[in-house]
Each structure stands twice: as structure tokens, then as C-alpha cells.
Amino acid sequence: MRADCFPSSDSPGPTVLAGEVLRRLRRPPIAGGPQALTDFFDRLLQARRRVLMLDYDGTLAPFEHDRMRAQPYQGTRELLLRIHTQPGTRLVVVSGRPAREAADLLALAPRPETWGVHGWERLTPSGQLVRAILPQQAKVAMTRVLALKPQLEGAGARVEQKYASIAIHTRGLSAQQAAQVRALIAEFDPPADGPPRPEGIYLQSFDGGFELRALGPNKGSVVRGVLREEPRETLIAYLGDDVTDEDAFAALGGRGLAVRVLPPAGAETPPRRSIAHVALRAPEELLQFLQRWADLPFGAVPPP
């Protein structure tokens, strides 16, 4: 694979992108709701190139205490396969998991393009895995995090080492246990008047824990890379549930629809602000969206 297929060197770092997201949050809310979906699907039917990008955990599959049991919602695979095989449509999965792990859990054949570790890994449909180069500073910082593994696991957390990050899972822990875990990794997110943060890595919360991530690619840089590879008129939708997906929403610009996927009724998470155009409740509204896309007669679009 060509080096320029990997959006790493020219992608803004998380500090810059976070500022971009905050600026967008201060603007008037983006018009959304049912009409936004209607307008999008009207445009989608006329588009000659389409890209559907989706997160995995919390979007295509519910969260599970045992992460390897997180299977897609019933009916999701069949709809994604129909979309994946549509003419002029590109299906892309973007996950915080390792790319092969996400692809294996989704278990689509033929396999779609899959990005893992928030954009550090790219798994092509042919099975080729490409990774961005991990800076030495990040490697050193991750070693410091791994030195805390016995204490973190002693507090009840589950520590997962990935290529460019270390996830610390706290799902199912009490508030006291979660606070103890957070205190153990406080040095990686010091206050403004505290000691300097270790170079090459930063701390980000997610739904179910914390992640120490190397500075570099993120889901927003994946979107920008896909946009560069596609014709200008390509229409894109990105579906995601977590704060890490806000980077992707921001990167869409005016080229597509940002969809926040909400958890099933009864599995609510703390409210937070989002720059998504619309929100869909999993699994019912998610499946309706995929069904609507899968049912469009793209083969009927006349040639220019």
C-alpha cells in the first residue's frame, strides 16, 4: 500500500482537533431531526459515489463486560452486506479496537475496509494490515503506563495493550473503584498548574474506562484520509456513539451526515454535547437507517 494512503503525518494532533470541536459546539446547533435524514437520503440516491463509515462498539454492537462477546445487533450484518455490495458504495469500519479484532467480530464476507486503534491501523479488504509509525516518545510513555498494570488490575480494572494505546476498562466497577483507577493514572493528565504531562501520550475518557493514546492519528484523520481518496461529489455518512467519534464528525465538514448512535432504551449513559446532525437510538433506529440505505435502487441512477 502507498504511504500516502495512510493519514498520519498531515493530520492535526488531538489538541488542535479538540479546539476545533469546541468551536463548533459554541456555534448555533446544526439543524437536524427527521428532515435532515430525508434530505440526506434524497441526495444519497442521486450520488454516484457513497461512503458509509461506522464505529463498532456502542454503534454496531452493544457494550459487553466481556469485550469479545460484543456481537452486532441482530440484522445488522445482513444489512451491511447488502450495502457493502452496492455499486458505487464504500463501507468503512472505524474502531478503537485493533483492526483485525474489529473485522473478526463483525465477520462480514467479503471483508470491508477496517481502521483500528482510532486510526493507527488500516486493514484492507484483501487482508493487508498497515500501521502508522509509533514515535519513540509514545513507546516510552506506554511503558510507564504498563508498569502500573498490577496496581490497576488490583483496583479491578482490565488493562488492554494495543499498538498505539493502552485501554483501561472500568465497566462494572463501583464509583470508588473507578476513582481509585483514575487516581493511579493521574500523572498522565495533570492539572494546568501541575507537573508536565509525559510526552507523546495523552489521556482520554471513553464510555467504560480510560485510554492512554499516542499523539497522532484519530478517527478524524481517518475521515480526512477517506475524503482525500474520494471524488469531491462523494456523499458520506459517519455513525458513532462515543466522544472519540466527535473528531470524525468535525472532519466531515460539509461533505456528509454525522449521526450519533444512542444506547438502547434502559442503557442510558451520562448526557453530553455532540456536534452530530442527528441522533438515532440503537438498535431500532440504527437498523431503520441501514435498511433505508440498503433498499435504495442505486443501480437505477442514469449515466451523465
Ranges and model annotations:
Residues 4-9, 14-34, 47, 220-304:
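Mg2+-dependent phosphoryl-transfer enzymes with acidic/Ser/Thr/Gly-rich catalytic loops
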Residues 31-48, 101-108:
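Short amphipathic alpha-helices and their capping/turn segments at secondary-structure boundaries
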Residues 45-66, 93, 223:
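Asp-based phosphoryl-transfer active-site loop
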Residues 63-66, 125-129, 271-273:
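Short acidic, glycine/proline-rich loop/turn micro-motifs
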Residues 71-161:
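Active-site phosphate-binding/coordination module
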Residues 160-239, 243-252, 256:
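Conserved acidic, metal-coordinating active-site core of Asp-based
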